[in-house]
């Protein structure tokens, strides 16, 4: 303690340095750095400014060595301020160098005390620092340790060790018979040299023990090496920073316990610790990097934690490490740790999903596996007894609720990870007896001799839609089919021609119930189907457990229908006999070109077909109403339009009587089926004079 007392006395001399006029400007400069965010208040303290003023050092590198690492970059600016604040008093002449041989002048950045009996004129004289028999440390460039000190805390002390010293290549020729390790420590801030720090040990072995109790949150350890041909030479040599370590004080009163599936930790964090990092490590992975298992990162956890997300039935090792920011780097203490094994709880499956296949003959089941136990799926025709869900039962009581061993599904189970990162168990292609129209699936969690039923879901198997017919009328279509067994309704999707429903259906759809189907004799589609045709895909719809279940699809093609409508205006002579007829045609949609048409005359009745009478001579008219071409037996428009006023044809009715009617002149019955030619009012097709 005597040496330690001398050290404290030397570092804090009795003279009042608050009287130093340079302190106030330096404090203002420090505050500017803090306010701008360039340095942290805890990294650059007023004590550092006082230490530099007491030392009397003004060289940049000397000041840099005395500042913390995160502040060292501002040493040049501090030296400039000191130079500006130093009074411009004349310096005394340096004393003569003693003979016969002067010692070498110190290089740039070295400090040398004046060798004179008279005190220097400047007021910033160097205050000698006790060195325990070693030469005072001379500041040069900032030193960086080559090695780390291995620190091991025991119940009574801290054990320190480091690699044995090896001379660098440029000193291999020197005699370094003596290697002295000076192990020093300092709380809160790293010492800038071994002189002002607490001497832990002076040893020739690469190890030491520190028996002092740590009371500050951070303790810095340094190993400085003095080497020489003898002990005296080694003590006179300048020390070299060889190894360093930072020891963060751990938590105390560490306690861990489980409470109903949660894990609760309690401790006391030392003063000055900013946060405690908590890790939950699976017991099988305790040797892996623990950083990935850190939890509760949003809180400081200074007094403990509550972990609400451990998995029941698992065993974990919980670790707590105090965290302190040291020169911009987060340092962690050694871990306080304990193992916790959470008791497995019997939990029901509540998110069973049943997906019926497109053919309706099978289904896929999926669910989230519970934390403990295994899940068995039971398939039944009527489901388990009411009130058995989420109740713990002996496995032997499953038969009493209707779940007998032969109802258990024995297919292989697979597991997959969903897009949200959660595990899902899956059974694919599960079928049930063909005579069942409905099947109930019940998940049962089994653990030891205990069982718990989860949520039961059902799947419905509807009949296949057959005998589909689409009847075409002039202004609508009527869809008929055999109503499928077990269906509450039938849905019809429209899709392009040739579309495979297995590729997905997202177009227009229509749905009809059994009551509506029987009332109207089918599904009536008025103006709903495209003129160019489409495919219709029908599927039965049923409901199971509030879920909508769509059965297998059946399809039919609709070729489409082009609706045309013509108008006839008959011209007559003064006696009322027909002479000419003007014919106009319009389409339901614009079509380039047109098929051939024939105007047929039958003197007895309205013509029934293109062959029921005689064709009438026709010719197109130009814009002035004159014949634009020679007469022919066939009409053919250049384009069919929705307006019908773009092109007119004229017919020669001289000497004709009875009736006329326009027909599509196409030989292919298949093509005829996609064109509907609508007649005008019958009276407009009659040639007989109105007076007759």
From Swiss-Prot:
Residues 89-107 have a biased composition (Pro residues). Disruption phenotype: Loss of DNA conjugation when disrupted in recipient strain (MKD8), no effect when disrupted in donor strain (mc(2)155). The recipient strain does not secrete EsxB. Residues 1-21 have a biased composition (Basic and acidic residues). Residues 1-23, 87-134 are annotated as: Disordered. Coiled coil: none annotated. It comes from the Bacteria. May be involved in assembly of the ESX-1 / type VII specialized secretion system (T7SS), which exports several proteins including EsxA and EsxB. Involved in DNA conjugation in recipient (MKD8) but not donor (mc(2)155) strain. DNA conjugation in M.smegmatis is unidirectional with distinct donor and recipient strains; mc(2)155 is a donor strain while MKD8 is a recipient strain. Mutations in a donor strain that alter DNA transfer do not always alter DNA transfer in a recipient strain. This is Putative ESX-1 scaffolding and assembly protein SaeA. It comes from Mycolicibacterium smegmatis (strain MKD8) (Mycobacterium smegmatis).
């Amino acid at each position: 303690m005597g040496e330690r007392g001398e050290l404290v006395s030397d570092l804090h001399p009795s003279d009042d340095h608050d009287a130093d006029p340079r302190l106030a400007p330096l404090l203002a400069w420090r505050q500017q750095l803090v306010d701008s965010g360039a340095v942290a208040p805890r990294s650059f303290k007023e004590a550092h400014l006082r230490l530099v003023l007491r030392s009397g050092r003004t060289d940049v590198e000397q000041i840099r060595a005395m500042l913390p690492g995160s502040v060292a970059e501002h040493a040049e600016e501090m030296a400039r301020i000191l130079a500006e604040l130093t009074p411009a008093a004349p310096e005394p002449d340096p004393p003569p160098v003693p003979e016969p041989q002067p010692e070498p002048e110190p290089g740039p950045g070295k400090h040398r005390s004046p060798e004179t009996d008279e005190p220097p004129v400047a007021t910033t004289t160097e205050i000698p620092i006790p060195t325990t028999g070693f030469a005072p440390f001379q500041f040069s460039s900032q030193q960086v340790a080559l090695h780390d000190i291995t620190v091991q805390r025991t119940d009574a002390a801290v054990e320190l060790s480091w690699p044995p010293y090896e001379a660098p290549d440029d000193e291999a020729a020197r005699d370094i018979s003596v290697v002295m390790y000076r192990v020093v420590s300092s709380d809160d801030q790293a010492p800038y040299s071994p002189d002002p720090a607490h001497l832990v040990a002076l040893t020739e072995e690469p190890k030491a023990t520190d028996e002092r109790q740590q009371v500050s949150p951070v303790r810095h350890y340094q190993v400085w090496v003095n080497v020489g041909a003898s002990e005296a030479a080694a003590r006179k040599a300048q020390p070299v920073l060889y190894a360093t370590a930072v020891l963060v004080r751990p938590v105390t009163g560490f306690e861990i316990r489980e409470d109903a599936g949660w894990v609760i930790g309690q401790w006391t964090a030392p003063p000055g610790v900013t946060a405690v990092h908590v890790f939950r490590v699976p017991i099988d992975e305790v040797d892996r990097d623990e950083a990935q298992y850190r939890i509760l990162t949003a809180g400081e956890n200074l007094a403990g934690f509550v972990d609400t997300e451990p998995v029941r039935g698992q065993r974990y090792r919980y670790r707590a490490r105090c965290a302190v920011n040291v020169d911009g780097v987060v340092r962690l203490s050694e871990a306080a740790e304990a193992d916790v094994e959470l008791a497995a709880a019997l939990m029901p499956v509540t998110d069973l999903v049943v997906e019926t296949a497109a053919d309706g003959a099978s289904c896929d089941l999926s669910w989230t596996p519970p934390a403990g136990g295994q899940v068995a799926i039971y398939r039944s025709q009527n489901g388990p007894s009411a009130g058995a869900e989420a109740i713990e039962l002996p496995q032997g009581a499953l038969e009493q609720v209707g779940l007998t061993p032969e109802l258990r599904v024995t297919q292989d189970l697979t597991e997959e990870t969903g897009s949200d990162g959660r595990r899902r168990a899956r059974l694919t292609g599960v079928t049930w007896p063909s005579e069942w129209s409905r099947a109930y699936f019940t998940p049962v969690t089994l653990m030891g001799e205990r069982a718990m039923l989860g949520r039961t879901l059902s799947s419905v198997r509807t009949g296949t839609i057959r005998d589909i017919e689409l009847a075409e009328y002039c202004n609508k279509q009527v869809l008929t089919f055999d109503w499928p067994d077990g269906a509450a309704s039938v849905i019809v999707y429209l899709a392009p021609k040739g579309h495979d429903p297995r590729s997905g259906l997202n177009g227009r759809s229509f749905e009809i119930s059994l009551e509506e189907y029987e009332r109207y004799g089918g599904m009536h589609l008025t103006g709903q189907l495209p003129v160019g045709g489409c495919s219709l895909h029908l599927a039965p719809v049923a409901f199971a457990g509030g879920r909508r279940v769509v059965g297998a699809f059946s399809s039919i093609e609709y070729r489409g229908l082009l609706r045309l409508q013509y108008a006839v205006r008959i011209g007559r002579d003064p006696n009322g006999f027909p002479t000419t007829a003007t014919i106009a045609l319009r389409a339901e949609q614009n079509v380039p070109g047109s098929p051939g048409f024939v105007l047929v005359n039958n003197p007895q009745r309205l013509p029934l077909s293109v062959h029921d009478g005689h064709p009438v001579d026709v010719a197109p008219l130009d814009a002035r109403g004159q014949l634009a071409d020679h007469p022919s037996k066939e009409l053919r428009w250049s384009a069919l339009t929705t307006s019908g006023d773009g092109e007119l044809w004229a017919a020669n009715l001289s000497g004709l009587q009875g009736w006329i009617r326009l027909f599509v002149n196409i030989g292919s019955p298949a093509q005829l089926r996609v064109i509907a030619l609508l007649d005008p009012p019958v009276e407009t097709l009659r040639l007989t004079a109105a007076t007759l």
